[in-house]
């Protein structure tokens, strides 16, 4: 291969060409010749480094003349300084120029050499004339300028020294940190080396022990000649291999497990490989030793915690235990239960099977899905003051509706917004003082009692409206009973005070007859005279409500998941299911997933009582909620859940309960069943609703029932009225789980249908003595029964026998009295009662007998107890339950 360079670029250029910089790249063409007649032309460029030369390097002889010229070019004004008498101002003026161009300071500029250059220019001579003609003021000004320049130079010098000192400190600190890091790295390296040596020694020791445990090698003479020849061939070095050592096996490419603290040295150390721990080596040696010795370890059984619901199939139980379904069926067969793999067993049987297989059991019920639905009680520090919730109750003709309308007119926010646009059953009134009051409209008191029946306390204060000209009416008394049953404070608003026949004193006296003691008579019930027609006393009523709320200290936590109650619900044609919600605590927001009774949904919109869309609603704020799957019932508690799956689970359980209740408990609840429920709940009060034909009979019945009460049980009359049994009476009885007693009265059709649907029992009487006897019997059933023991006999244990199916059986001799099967027994050891239970087996000569007389021998076994010893005494007795009754 030959190279041919083109040097045409190196020829001298024409003289008439424009001047330019000298090129630093020389290019040429080279042709490369290859075999088989192939060639290739290549462009070759040669780059030269351009060096910049100063005038001093180019012409050394002209250096003395160039230096004064440079000094004159950079600092022309300082050169004229010798010609001026005031030397100080002229010397100080070029100070900034000298600072900006430090090169001038390095080049000497003597005055004799610079003076002739300045004298050649006439402008310098004129400048000297100007300086000689300066006035005193100008001289002083220049002197001050020079002084300030000197001060600035001093400050700059001090600042530079401070910067230099700080930089020196930083350098020293960084040097110290580097030294400390180096020391730590050295320490880590030494520790790593020590750990490596320890692991190496442990591995060598383990290998030595493993070699010692292996069986001795077979002698060469005993092995076949072929195997020996093969080994000899293996021992000979391969051709061309020489004495090259054997190639090490490839290292494991897995990452090293980090031990201890990660340091910079460890992070950048790629040579270190993951090493086996000492415990791992020991486990490996132990496994190999057992393998050589032929020891086989049985697989260890895994004990699991099995969650068992109320009912479960055999297949599901086996899956949860990770066992075979056949094994589960075998255990059931041993117990005499023949079932298929798809059959359902109860939780008790499933627990026995799981415990038989060695697993632990966790019993759960369907009602567990509601656990955690209602949040825990809030701490006092998180609670904030909220608006009171007020329910207005009273007779329909006493101005309750007029009072509600008048209170709406006092709402300043409603006046600004143009009035309330719709009525949703609950609304807020914004007072001029900035306070807020939430009013709950409960026509007919139906929603009020249904809320109380579900255990929800929504109302904080009850405002009882009584007409001053009409006094206390039957529905007023019913409203009083509702307020007492709810256990909330009451404020009496005496309405229609603008009429001339108004008599507030009469109203107060009539209230006193129904155990409502007003403040004027020494009680704690506040009274406010008002007039809904003229607006008189409304401000006083609002102040009284706020005062009562302040005494109650009504507070709630707004910073949590919302909880509230459904005031009313309806199915709107355009918007779907709509529920009016009164938030009790927390904040309800758009997008929350809520559960209300047996319905759930995601909040699509919140509408306040003025028809405005809002993003959230805090405590005591009533809003309409859109987005529920169906219309809930009034009084249902609303809760916010974390997911749709949880909401579906809760609502499915509640819907199943409602369906089972409709199917299974369609009949009426009897008085005996209701009393048994009351006993189970440890209630010592018997609630009753009494309706009579005349007021005298009603008062006589109430007095007779009050005399039946004792220290343990008493009759609580919720409501006494004159006239037939109405639907409102049934509603009150449903909420309180009370029977209705009718004396010479009957229930109308609506009340009978409501009682049949709600399961309320209505009893009719015409003789007061029969009524009192039945109530006395019902109250006697609420008393706890008396237990009386009757001694039967004693037996001494002579011997203990172990029976495969039964367990331990005690061979006894009856020493006193008689022993009966199924009676209660006590096991006495050293005159101390060890166990108390029942006899499960009583045998005589392998035959089951009912009783064994004194002096005879028999076999006994206890229910669920096996710790019996020779010499123990068995005491047999009967327990008699004696029902107590009122005297």
From Swiss-Prot:
Region feature G1, mapped onto this chain: 394-401
GO molecular function annotation: GTP binding; GTPase activity; guanosine tetraphosphate binding; translation initiation factor activity
Top-level taxon: Bacteria
Main localization, broad class: cytoplasm
Composition-biased stretches (Basic and acidic residues): 148-178, 185-194, 201-215, 267-276
Region (G2), start-end ranges: 419-423
Region G4, residue ranges: 495-498
G5: annotated segments: 531-533
CDD domains: IF2_eIF5B, IF2_mtIF2_II, mtIF2_IVc
Record InterPro entries: EF-G-like_DII, EFTu-like_2, IF2_assoc_dom_bac, IF2_II, IF2_N, P-loop_NTPase, Small_GTP-bd, T_Tr_GTP-bd_dom
Chain spans, region Disordered: 1-291
A GO CC annotation given for this chain: cytosol
Biased composition (Low complexity): 58-117
Record-given protein name: Translation initiation factor IF-2
Cross-referenced HAMAP family: IF_2_B
Protein family (similarity comment): Belongs to the TRAFAC class translation factor GTPase superfamily. Classic translation factor GTPase family. IF-2 subfamily.
PANTHER family: TR-TYPE G DOMAIN-CONTAINING PROTEIN, TRANSLATION INITIATION FACTOR IF-2-RELATED
Job description of the protein: One of the essential components for the initiation of protein synthesis. Protects formylmethionyl-tRNA from spontaneous hydrolysis and promotes its binding to the 30S ribosomal subunits. Also involved in the hydrolysis of GTP during the formation of the 70S ribosomal complex.
tr-type G domain mapped to chain residues: 385-553
Residue numbers binding GTP: 394-401, 441-445, 495-498
Alphabetical UniProt keywords: Cytoplasm, GTP-binding, Initiation factor, Nucleotide-binding, Protein biosynthesis
